[in-house]
A protein has these predicted regions:
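Bacterial N-terminal signal peptides that target proteins for export
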Residues: 1-12
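Bacterial Sec-dependent N-terminal signal peptides
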Residues: 2, 16-42
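Boundary/entry segment of secreted carbohydrate-active catalytic domains
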Residues: 40-83
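Hydrophobic faces of well-ordered beta-strands that scaffold small-molecule active sites
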Residues: 48-52, 95-97, 129-133, 182-186, ...
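Acidic-and-aromatic substrate-binding clefts and catalytic sites of carbohydrate-active enzymes
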Residues: 58-59, 70-78, 101-113, 191-194, ...
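Glycoside hydrolase catalytic-domain groove-lining segments
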Residues: 83-84, 232-234, 242-315, 325-328, ...
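Substrate-binding cleft and catalytic face of glycoside hydrolase catalytic domains
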Residues: 84-211, 215-234, 240
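Aromatic-rich peripheral "rim/lid" segments of glycoside hydrolase catalytic domains that contact
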Residues: 310-326, 330-388
Length: 388
């Protein structure tokens, strides 16, 4: 999702889609104690999910670096305490976690061990799990798909082997920990390809010769690795800009032999100065229907976020309410995941403070802080449909 910092920066076939939804598109750290419910890995009818990949670092800061964060606990108005209980009370039933190969931070946030720990907590809380492989040491998005530092010397064959090895390693660790993810992304917002330059699709001169075949090979290495560990997991190919017609991308991927079980989209309806949020929501709904109809599979909105400032709260809540009402009625949509809802618009991860980066805080969370407690706003209530 960090693409926000770089970009902040048909219906006639629907009947066919409904009848063919179950045909595979591909063809051929925390310090807070949560009180868990019974673990569950059953398919959810509709995912109201949250990507909380920053939660471990936030909880670490609450204990070890209090000057970096404006609160010491997650709690809601009903008395629920701990991030997962608060999210569950708000209606969240699934958790998404990103995976980096060799994270920059020495604490290893979003590395294998952190992801396994967070996934275990989610499963113990009775939530479904999505794993989001970036195949990078940092955010992979439309502005950057940087090959991990330890992989840069490999050619296509070698990179495919590293994708296989890394995917199996992380998923096998999850399996050993008793976690069975329902969904696995093989790449994050991969509209421009992945693992640049080998898997890059375009440059300033246009489409790169051989780019699609390379990208498909790398993506398929991830797909096959997922199926070798969790055969029933839905493998997602994820791109940005749900408001755009994205059929061209999946046409090209399919033509190159790419495999996927589900399509993933990002939707940030308040980030395009050329469109109103209502227009972006409407376009996203139409495109979800179109993609599902054309490729015979469900669509997951893997990321969503709206502005969290006090002056925007009312309209942001309305935006989320209207989108969730529309998308929930679609049998072709598998669910929606809010990106990092637990932040308050002030806290930011330490890696954002590097001198060559110096990024601001993420301003599309769904929590607020009174200086001691992080609690949900009306945005999370509208998104989850539960109490807060």
């Amino acid at each position: 999702m960090s693409t926000l910092y770089s970009r902040l920066a048909t219906l006639s076939a629907l009947a066919f889609a409904v009848s063919s939804l179950f045909v595979g598109c591909g063809g051929s750290g925390g310090n807070q104690k949560d009180e868990p419910d019974a673990p569950s890995v059953d398919e959810v009818a509709f995912a109201r999910g949250a990507d909380v990949s920053w939660a471990s670092e936030m909880e670490y800061d609450m204990t070890h670096n209090p000057s970096r964060i404006s609160g010491t606990a997650f709690k809601d108005s009903k008395g629920n305490a701990g991030l997962y209980p608060v999210l569950k009370a708000a209606g969240i039933n699934a958790i998404r976690l990103r995976v980096w190969v060799k994270p920059e931070d020495p604490n290893g946030w979003s590395g294998k061990d952190d992801v396994v720990n967070m996934a275990k907590r989610a499963a113990e809380a009775g939530m479904s799990v999505m794993i989001d492989f970036h195949y990078s040491d940092f955010f992979a998005d439309p502005s950057r798909q940087k090959t991990p530092a330890d992989w840069v010397s490999f050619d296509l064959k070698g990179l495919s082997a590293k994708v296989t090895e890394h995917t199996k390693d992380v998923l096998s660790a999850l399996k050993s920990a008793g976690v069975t993810p329902l969904w696995v992304q093989v790449g994050n917002e991969t509209r421009p390809g992945m693992l640049w330059e080998t898997g890059r699709l375009y440059n300033d001169k246009g489409e790169i010769a051989g780019g699609w075949s390379n990208y498909a090979a790398l993506s398929n290495a991830g797909y096959d690795a997922v199926k070798s560990v969790f055969p029933a997991a839905k493998v997602i190919v994820h791109i940005d800009n749900a408001y755009e017609d994205n059929t061209w991308f999946f046409d090209k991927l399919k033509a190159a032999g790419g495999k996927f079980d589900m399509i993933g989209l990002s939707h940030y309806p308040m980030t395009n100065s050329g469109m109103t949020w209502k227009a972006m929501n409407s376009s996203a709904i139409l495109n979800i229907k179109t993609l599902a109809a054309k490729y015979g599979c469900k669509v997951m909105v893997c990321e969503i976020g709206v502005r969290d400032t006090a002056s925007d709260l009312a309209v942001s809540t309305q935006c989320i309410t209207e989108f969730m009402s529309s998308v929930k009625s679609l049998s072709v949509c598998a669910g929606v995941f809010y990106w990092e809802p637990q932040v308050d618009g002030k806290w930011k991860p330490s890696i954002y403070e590097k001198s060559d980066r110096n990024w601001g805080a993420y301003s599309m969370g769904a929590f607020t802080s009174d200086g001691s407690t992080f609690s949900p706003t009306s945005i999370l209530s509208a998104f989850g449909g539960g109490d807060s």
